[in-house]
Protein backbone atom coordinates (compact mmCIF):
# COMPACT_ATOMS: atom_id res chain seq x y z
CA UNK A 1 0.00 0.00 0.00
CA UNK A 2 2.83 2.41 0.78
CA UNK A 3 4.30 1.97 -2.68
CA UNK A 4 1.01 2.87 -4.35
CA UNK A 5 0.65 6.01 -2.24
CA UNK A 6 4.21 7.02 -3.02
CA UNK A 7 3.63 6.60 -6.74
CA UNK A 8 0.52 8.77 -6.60
CA UNK A 9 2.41 11.53 -4.79
CA UNK A 10 5.38 11.31 -7.14
CA UNK A 11 3.13 12.01 -10.11
CA UNK A 12 2.40 15.59 -9.12
CA UNK A 13 2.59 17.53 -12.34
CA UNK A 14 0.83 18.49 -15.51
CA UNK A 15 0.20 15.23 -17.27
CA UNK A 16 2.87 12.66 -16.42
CA UNK A 17 5.98 14.51 -17.60
CA UNK A 18 6.72 16.07 -14.21
CA UNK A 19 7.46 14.18 -11.01
CA UNK A 20 7.93 15.07 -7.37
CA UNK A 21 11.01 17.23 -7.00
CA UNK A 22 10.63 18.53 -10.54
CA UNK A 23 8.79 21.75 -11.19
CA UNK A 24 5.71 22.02 -13.32
CA UNK A 25 2.54 24.01 -13.67
CA UNK A 26 -0.30 24.05 -16.14
CA UNK A 27 -1.77 27.46 -16.73
CA UNK A 28 -5.11 28.12 -18.36
CA UNK A 29 -3.31 28.53 -21.67
CA UNK A 30 -2.37 24.83 -21.52
CA UNK A 31 1.28 25.79 -21.23
CA UNK A 32 3.23 22.91 -19.70
CA UNK A 33 6.14 25.07 -18.63
CA UNK A 34 7.88 24.39 -15.35
CA UNK A 35 7.11 26.06 -12.05
CA UNK A 36 7.58 25.02 -8.42
CA UNK A 37 5.55 21.93 -7.55
CA UNK A 38 5.97 20.49 -4.08
CA UNK A 39 5.61 16.80 -3.34
CA UNK A 40 2.05 15.86 -2.51
CA UNK A 41 0.64 19.04 -4.01
CA UNK A 42 -2.37 18.71 -6.26
CA UNK A 43 -1.08 20.51 -9.33
CA UNK A 44 -2.97 18.55 -11.97
CA UNK A 45 -5.06 20.92 -14.05
UniProtKB/Swiss-Prot annotation:
Protein role: Metallothioneins have a high content of cysteine residues that bind various heavy metals. Confers tolerance to cadmium (Cd) and plays a role in Cd and zinc (Zn) homeostasis.
Organism for this UniProt entry: Arabidopsis thaliana (Mouse-ear cress)
GO function term, MF aspect, one: metal ion binding
Family of this protein: Belongs to the metallothionein superfamily. Type 15 family.
Superkingdom as given in the UniProt entry: Eukaryota
Keyword vocabulary terms for this entry: Metal-binding, Metal-thiolate cluster
Keyword Metal-binding attributed: yes
Protein name: Putative metallothionein-like protein 1B
UniProt-listed GO biological process terms: response to metal ion
Amino acid sequence: MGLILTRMILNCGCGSSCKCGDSCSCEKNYNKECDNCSCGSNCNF
